[in-house]
């Protein structure tokens, strides 16, 4: 069987590796317009903020690896068209050579692309996006310039908040804008996001929330020099747009069933409306166990797993995704937040009737006074069924990075908050309290 | 209704508090021969090893708290007999006053007692056990003596290993004995326990494993001065017996159905063979989801939860325990180990046919070279059903203290190792890798 994979980042790599390792013997062709693969975008802010010196280790696979496994890999090759009826992919190499690859099975792993705010001045020099390695390099080069002092970051989601931290670590003045009233609004309720806002402000990042960018203005050299919002005008030397991503599905969105944001609709086998076409990673929808429905959640962790599922199904073993909870985490200047499932706000937006239980305690036993950070927890649950649909944790302790994985499984398994109260969570003073804050938050649920 | 609770430590307190908070109006009598309550025994080594200065904060409840809630609480009062037929408890106060308390419902929360090795010289001065606060005080006083230099700890389970660390932190020479070939043998397989052995040895603790104590010898003042094993004789100034605990069920073991170690047999409502008698905490059996059967696991975390379950059932709300996995953790000189369910060795001893998948990786993304400890993981699963029945984690990273809670839930929910491979575990370089070591260990399972 011949399998063509368009897109060689996390999802495409996971699909190809699953096929190569578990179902050897298939002919695999991988195509990507980029020159590099497996770039860990979430490492950009760590590198650009000089928490690590170089970007070299932000990759985990390269074309030669796949060539060595017998894969035909075409980098810097742009797919121009897919003929779904005749099962052919048309592409052009860097040197304009025409490529036609027939397929038995096609895998769309084209990921997502940054949303471009359609504002006057959007194409000025000095306005950047942040997804690809090359975009990270461009921003790193800008940060190196002495004259680039004031940086506006538009969008205080994960990417925006992280690159704002990086800019501050590089000694820049940083203005962080968002239309929402807090940072991280899509993953956390205000009571939690405010903790990150305070952390950002304490570290000298200027917050401009509830504020909408209207226009970018240029200096004489055509470089962005001002950002105009619905509230004021600010002098800036650089703008980084981080208002979000959308599915990069143009190649197929007119032929295959798509979600409201253009993402390719798939079932739990990652199969699209065309049985010979699979879609994986950020280009595809995904089943949310919190929502109990398909939705769109662009995360590298989902990309990897969806690739594994597609690889098995294409390889011949029927395997359903167990669905996801949108588990995520962020660490800014040592302040950590993790969440999974839906926030109260997100749940209400989706019409779910929910309640929540909040609690705050020290991570470790109260009698340990050193290195014992406080932890805020919120458990969100359906009021009637009491099924857990979300959890948020915030602390300087890293242990919350493990505990959120338990909540992710609890949502997947449709556990109620009352069942969670009885879950066997171990106790050792070095790590937690006899009445673990997760147990107490669950016990306290009205 | 009148409810008598015998034993006022974690399980008894949880039962009483559940009744008081959720089902007010019952008459509650609490009886305990001890003068203190709610002592966190797992804090003893932390206090005696001077990681904290004083024991004052190792308690979370006192008799007056319960008196204020209308409870009749009799401390330093020893129950001599229970007349199950006539539902009466006979006890004697410190001043030898006779107490008779009739009950509608009785709760046995008498905990566990240290196993005393029946060896010549077992009653010599300078031979200690470690369960109660008073026993912690006695050991602390011994550690303060200049002349007490060489300390033998018999039994390298959790309590023995922790008090060995404490003795070393107090500058003592420490000899740690165990009949097994490693420390922590009941919770960890050798490949994992060896990591703790190396850690103990590196910190100067003399390990004597695969060695059985035979006799204790005394000096002229009747103080223990030598320990004789099946291999050699050792001069010591103090012996701390930590060979384990057994259910403290003498008051009822001849009248109620008991487990092979004398623990009171209970169902998932914590009800004993006598419908008016409940048993909670270390005196009772408990349902193990790993084993899919009742067994005996003496842990404070189980004690708390079993008390909550009993309180609800007595109060009138039918509630089944969700069972436990025996989740546990230990941290010795900053080396952390957590486990849940059964080790390979424990599973095989119980006749289960199991396989396991091991993996080792850094906790955080590979490109973070600071504060990024390696983590060893073992997932144990039934060979045929591939149901996960155990997990072991070892690292200097504290994040394993959260991750083990996910495995505890996975065992409770009978997840297979293949389902675990697809679980939504988030990725952020600050906390983990794109291919999380838990995902990889599950993917690698043969």
Swiss-Prot record, chains A, B:
Catalytic activity, EC: 1.6.3.4
The positions annotated for binding NAD(+) are 159, 178, 187, 244, 298, 329
Instruction: Give the Pfam families listed for this entry.
Output: Pyr_redox_2, Pyr_redox_dim
Q: Where does FAD bind?
A: 7-11, 32, 42, 79, 109-112, 131, 158, 282, 299-301, 427
The record's cofactor note says:
Binds 1 FAD per subunit.
- Activity regulation details: Inhibited by hydrogen peroxide, sulfhydryl reagents and quinine, but not by EDTA.
EC main class here is: oxidoreductase
The modified positions for Cysteine sulfinic acid (-SO2H) read 42
Catalytic residue list: 10 (proton acceptor), 42 (redox-active)
Q: Which UniProt keywords apply?
A: FAD, Flavoprotein, NAD, Oxidation, Oxidoreductase, Redox-active center
GO molecular-function terms, A-Z: NADH dehydrogenase (ubiquinone) activity
Q: What is the annotated signal peptide range for this record?
A: none
pH sensitivity of activity: Optimum pH is 6.0-9.0. Below pH 6.0 the enzyme is reversibly inactivated, above pH 10.0 the enzyme is irreversibly inactivated.
> Which superkingdom?
Bacteria
Per the entry, which co-factors are needed?
Answer: FAD
Question: What does the subunit section of this Swiss-Prot or TrEMBL entry state?
Answer: Homodimer.
Similarity field: Belongs to the class-III pyridine nucleotide-disulfide oxidoreductase family.
Purpose: Catalyzes the four-electron reduction of molecular oxygen to water. Active on beta-NADH, but not on alpha-NADH, beta-NADPH or alpha-NADPH. Under aerobic conditions, oxygen acts as the electron acceptor. Under anaerobic conditions, DCIP and MB can replace oxygen as the electron acceptor.
Query: What is the protein's given name?
Result: NADH oxidase
The organism's lineage is: Bacteria, Bacillati, Bacillota, Bacilli, Lactobacillales
């Amino acid at each position: 069987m011949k399998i063509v994979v368009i897109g060689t980042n996390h999802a495409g790599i996971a699909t190809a590796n699953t096929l190569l390792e578990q179902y050897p013997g298939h002919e695999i062709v991988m195509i990507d317009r980029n020159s590099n693969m497996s770039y860990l975008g979430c490492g950009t802010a760590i590198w650009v903020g000089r928490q690590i010196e170089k970007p070299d280790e932000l990759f985990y696979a390269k074309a030669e690896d796949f060539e060595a496994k017998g894969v035909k890999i075409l980098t810097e090759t742009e797919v121009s068209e897919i003929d779904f009826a005749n099962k052919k992919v048309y592409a052009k190499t860097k040197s304009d050579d025409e490529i036609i690859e027939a397929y038995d099975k096609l895998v769309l792993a084209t990921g997502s692309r940054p949303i471009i705010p359609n504002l006057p001045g959007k194409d000025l020099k000095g306005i950047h996006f942040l997804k690809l390695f090359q975009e990270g390099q461009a921003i790193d080069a800008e940060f190196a310039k002495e004259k680039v002092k004031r940086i506006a970051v538009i969008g205080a989601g994960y990417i925006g908040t992280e690159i704002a931290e990086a800019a501050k670590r590089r000694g820049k003045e940083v203005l962080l804008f968002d239309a929402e009233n807090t940072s991280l609004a899509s993953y956390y309720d205000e009571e939690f996001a405010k903790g990150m806002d305070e952390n950002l402000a304490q570290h000298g990042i200027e917050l401009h929330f509830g504020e909408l960018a209207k226009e970018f203005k240029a200096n004489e050299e055509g470089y962005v020099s001002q950002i105009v919002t619905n509230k004021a005008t600010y002098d800036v030397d650089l703008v980084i747009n981080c208002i979000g991503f959308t599915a990069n599905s143009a190649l197929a969105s007119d032929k295959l069933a798509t979600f409201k944001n253009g993402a390719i609709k798939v079932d739990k086998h990652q199969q699209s409306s065309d049985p010979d076409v699979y879609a994986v990673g950020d280009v595809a929808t995904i089943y949310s166990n919190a929502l109990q429905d398909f939705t769109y959640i662009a995360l590298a962790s989902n990309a990897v797993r969806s690739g594994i599922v597609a690889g098995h199904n294409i390889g011949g073993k029927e395997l359903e995704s167990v669905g996801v909870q949108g588990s995520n985490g962020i660490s800014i200047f040592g302040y950590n937040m993790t969440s999974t499932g839906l926030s109260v706000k997100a749940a209400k937006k989706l019409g779910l009737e929910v309640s929540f239980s909040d609690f705050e305690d020290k991570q470790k036993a109260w009698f340990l006074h050193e290195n014992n950070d406080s932890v805020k927890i919120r458990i969100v649950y359906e009021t009637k069924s009491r099924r857990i649909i979300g959890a948020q944790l915030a602390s300087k302790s890293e242990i919350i990075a493990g505990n959120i994985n338990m909540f992710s499984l609890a949502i997947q398994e449709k556990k109620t908050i009352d069942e969670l109260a009885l879950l066997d969570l171990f106790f050792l003073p070095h790590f937690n309290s006899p009445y673990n804050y997760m147990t107490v938050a669950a016990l306290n649920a009205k």
